[in-house]
Structure formats: C-alpha cells, structure tokens
Amino acid sequence: MHELSVTQGLVDMLVEEAEKRKVKKVTKVTVVIGELTGIESESVKFYFDILTENTVAEGAELVFKIVRAQFKCTQCGNVFERSNFTFKCPVCGGQGVLIDKRGKEFYIESIEVE
C-alpha cells in the first residue's frame, strides 16, 4: 500500500519540475524501481493515472526499468541474481549477501515533454 505515497511524491516532483520549466505537457516518464523495494509497478501505474488527472502529466506514458539485485556467495564468491525468492548461491548453495545496494532504487530516470 506504500505505492500510493511514493507515487504521490513522484507526481508532486514531476508536476513541480514541469511548472518550473513552463512545460505544457509531460508525454513520457521513465521510472527506475529496484526489485528489493517492494514497490509494485502495476500499483504505481494505477495511482499515477489517478494522481495525474488534471495535471500536465495526465495521459503520460509511464515506463519502468526494473533493477535486479546482485548477491555474492559467502562461501564460493559467486556473483548471482536471486531467483525464486531465495538468496542461496546457485553454484554451491551457500548464503548470498547483497552487493552495492543494487535493487533498492526508486527514482525518475527521464521525463519527455512537448
């Protein structure tokens, strides 16, 4: 349910920036979401469509780029992306630890305007 609040923040930022730059219409917004944020892109899209009504971003295309988290095995050193909700190394079965905080992103990558 936190998608509503993060989407509200995203829309507020988007509209504020558009007003500063005297943009008449936002046509496309690309958002980066890390897989570990727990943010569901479908929910963001749902709230985005509602929250942008009667704004410069109404009807804008919303595109998502999902960033996969990478883990490193504590036993064999293998670097891998998790699958099937497990943090076990696919090579040796050891425990993986998160590398470089990848997968925790949530930000606007780009905005296209008319």
Curated annotation (Swiss-Prot):
Gene Ontology BP, a term: protein maturation
Keywords for this protein: Metal-binding, Nickel, Zinc
InterPro entries in alphabetical order: HypA/HybF
A GO term for molecular function: nickel cation binding
Pfam families: HypA
Annotated residues for binding of Ni(2+): 2
Keyword field contains Zinc: yes
Binding site for Zn(2+): 73, 76, 89, 92
Record's keyword annotation contains Metal-binding: yes
Family label: Belongs to the HypA/HybF family.
Purpose: Involved in the maturation of [NiFe] hydrogenases. Required for nickel insertion into the metal center of the hydrogenase.
Full protein name: Hydrogenase maturation factor HypA
